[in-house]
Amino acid sequence: MLTAVMKDELIKGLLEIFSDNNMEAIILYGSNARNESTAESDIDIAIIMKKDMDDAVRERLIRWSADMDLRYDRVFSIIDIQEKNMQKWGNLLPFYQNVKKEGVVLWKEA
């Protein structure tokens, strides 16, 4: 289960990593979004991006995600999806359909 504390830290951390305004939304999907998670469930997060992230930002994201895994004894599975790909494939590819259908928006750019 994604607790309020985890959610707040997740949003704060991702906003710090993506301070370049490249992030459009943070979406929770999977068993946590469906309220079907167990103690062993990972926390599936999709980050909707305006453009590809550069290698330095990706490295920061990987390190930060690993820290979150250790801090909460949970696996944070974080993927990035370019907004243009979500627009193009959102109604065709099962994975994108799943994120759109069951996803819970945790944060969205104003």
What positions do the PLM features span?
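Short beta-strand->loop micro-motif that forms the acidic, two-metal-ion catalytic signature
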Residues: D44-I48
